[in-house]
Amino acid sequence: MTGVDEILNYQRNPDDDYYALLGCDENSTVEQITAEYKILALQHHPDKNDGEKEAEMKFQKLKEAKEILCDPSKRALYDKWRRSGIAMGFKQWLGMKDHVQQSMHWSKPNTKDRMLEGDGSKPSGPSSLGPSNPATRRASEGGAALWGRWGTGNQEPPSEVLSKFRNYEI
């Protein structure tokens, strides 16, 4: 199977989710990850499970997950791969990261935990703090909607299709 076929036929393995494997969240601290690892490592340690290949493989996966999630630089790379939604395994992505990251400008940023929670009654986020320049916000957040041609005086708004295209909605 070629590299392209592997990507096209890729099925994400639940064991590739190191956070779920350790029973943690991506907001967990290194101390929390280490504590969860110790509990699971005791259960699956090869010395406690004589000759069980499955327990040994699970222990190796747990060890690998702990090593990656406790190292800040490796964890940042893992989180980038995880959020990208790209159809390849983490190890394969790591081998190609310089090439792959160049084309990941389109991936969505992590917006999991906002500082200001929106309850629907008032706007949340940076725009709720006061007037802001829409040119400084991302197009996907309603900013950068600068239209009109430079120097022509044409101030007609762009068509709906053009706006969606510019905001990566189509």
From Swiss-Prot:
Q: What are the disulphide bonds in this sequence?
A: none
Keyword annotations for this protein?
Answer: Chaperone
Give TM regions.
none
The domain of life is: Eukaryota
**Any one cellular-component term (Gene Ontology):** cytoplasm
Q: Where is the composition biased (Basic and acidic residues)?
A: 110-120
Query: What PROSITE patterns does this protein map onto?
Result: DNAJ_2
- The UniProt record lists the J domain at 17-82
For this protein, the record's Pfam families field holds: DnaJ
**InterPro entries from the UniProt entry:** DnaJ_domain, J_dom_sf, JDP1-like
Composition bias of kind Low complexity appears in 121-134
Chain positions covered by the region annotation Disordered: 101-170
Q: What is this protein called?
A: J domain-containing protein
Q: Which organism is it from?
A: Bombyx mori
Q: Which gene encodes it?
A: jdp
